[in-house]
């Protein structure tokens, strides 16, 4: 139950695409390139785990972390980047054959869903830059 002066805020987005512009992976082929956009943070779905880890560890939100370049609270309050504009720009310039939204399941659960049957993706781990906030949470929640 919520207190009388509390409120719950929620939102959602609905997308629409013309059928000829649907991206369905049917044209994927060996040798295609994987492009990636960097993560800006935990985003909305990740905050349940963030709260759990930092609550259990009684993290000080006002503490400054050199690796973050700011306090933990400032880092956690940074607004989520909305990727629609950079994605639309790529769609204008490149023949995109698949798109994968990397969520809680990470690469292993999300990328295969966007691949054509029989195709695989090779991701070089050393080319993936993980934000410092992710490393801090992993270290804190170990």
Q: Predicted segment positions?
A:
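Glycine-rich anion-binding loops of enzyme active sites
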Residues: 1-48
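Glycine-/charge-enriched secondary-structure boundary and capping motifs
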Residues: 2-9, 60-61, 65-77, 81-142
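Ubiquitous "structural anchor" signal
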Residues: 23, 54, 112-114
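Acidic, glycine-rich loop-and-beta core segments that form the ion-binding/anion-interacting portion
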Residues: 28-74
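Phenylalanine-focused residue identity feature
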Residues: 12, 42-43, 54, 107, ...
């Amino acid at each position: 139950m919520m207190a009388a002066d509390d409120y719950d805020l929620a939102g959602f987005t609905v997308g629409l695409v013309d059928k000829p512009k649907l991206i369905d992976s049917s044209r994927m082929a060996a040798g295609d390139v994987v492009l990636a956009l960097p993560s800006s943070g935990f985003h909305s779905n990740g905050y349940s785990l963030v709260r759990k880890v930092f609550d259990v560890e009684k993290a000080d939100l006002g503490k400054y972390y050199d690796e973050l370049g700011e306090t933990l609270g400032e880092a956690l309050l940074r607004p989520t980047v909305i990727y629609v504009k950079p994605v639309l720009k790529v769609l204008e310039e490149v023949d995109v054959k698949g798109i994968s939204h990397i969520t809680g399941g990470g690469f292993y659960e999300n990328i295969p869903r966007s691949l054509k049957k029989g195709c695989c993706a090779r991701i070089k781990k050393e080319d993936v830059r993980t934000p410092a906030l992710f490393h801090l949470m992993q270290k804190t929640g170990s």
